[in-house]
């Protein structure tokens, strides 16, 4: 934005703020839901972009640590909680319990939620910077890493992100309609998301129907012909990226049996003593499932199983093979790798051999990536993160970042919590040292709300979200589920404004 345009933007926000000054004074005197009646006019005002775990954890630390800070969370969807709502597997309700903590934060007197606001479109980051003392970008990773191989645009090939969004009710993925008429599915990637997808494909419907999986996904999975899932990785058993919890769930999944190549585990048992305890436990469980002779009870269970899963190691995708009509996926060609190096420096190197696997469903689980949100915000396209130092966006005073857009899409929710707390601490330290000036009066949400009103944008408050929450819970109860998620943004807004 030019200096002239930036100046006009600043004047516009200040005018809107002065026009609403009387309203602001009345609000401070009488108080409204979500605002503190004791917050002085010069208190620090912080805007957080993104209503997922990173945003809520950043807000939590700010309002708990400093008693005068006012925090506003802006989220593009009408519903909060981001990856907890749309990324956590339906059969992991215990992970979603963190929503209770986020709800407490959203109900805090000095924290407000503003859903249905698209930062970068409805309001720019520069406009937010004019309205707040600090802006924290916590909007996560909306993009997918692509395989970059021929055939990945064929029907029957999906990203894990889109597939997860489909069964978890992300509005943008509600029309995905994956074709599950094939017998074999191949998942590329061996992290927790890959195992979540495998588990959803193979889980008995009687288990899934008690979760908050969307009804359209449940109906599709009930009719699925998928009976075999291969989970493919480019490195070996000692580098598998999932955690022991997710692996144990696969091993114990009712109605399934593991099918793996014993040759891929040669020499692994001899390395156990040298492994760190978490990796050792994971590898022991993997070896038990792959090559140990099962006991009588386990053998009977496996013999009765109608579905199978297994890891395939040292394989890299070369091409998705098309059907005879060149429309659908009919298989995948894999390069066979070998490992070179030791320890953390081990790398996969192609041997020149290839292997073709017949399959009608290919799901790529090779990672998410963040995307730029606004031309005014620096972005490292190669690393797919906002360049930062301890959460401070480089060369941009008053702008911070937390979560995946800060460090990349890695780790579990606890990792994001610690990362977000770190950014909040950095911001508060800057206030304490005076490097972040909070002495001037900023309009905060009052100024932004005036801008949004002029542009015809109606934000969704947290109390509005609670109407959606109640209706989803009611619909779920009629089906014996925790909730039945709304899939259409228009319907969400209609319920919120009823």
Swiss-Prot record:
Keywords recorded for this protein, A-Z: Cholesterol metabolism, Electron transport, FAD, Flavoprotein, Lipid metabolism, Membrane, Mitochondrion, Mitochondrion inner membrane, NADP, Oxidoreductase, Steroid metabolism, Sterol metabolism, Transit peptide, Transport
Cofactor requirements of the protein: FAD
Main location as per UniProt: mitochondrion
Name assigned to this protein: NADPH:adrenodoxin oxidoreductase, mitochondrial
Similarity-based family: Belongs to the ferredoxin--NADP reductase type 1 family.
Native organism: Salvelinus fontinalis
GO cellular component, one term: mitochondrial inner membrane
Catalysed reactions, semicolon-separated: 2 reduced [adrenodoxin] + NADP(+) + H(+) = 2 oxidized [adrenodoxin] + NADPH
Gene Ontology MF annotations: oxidoreductase activity
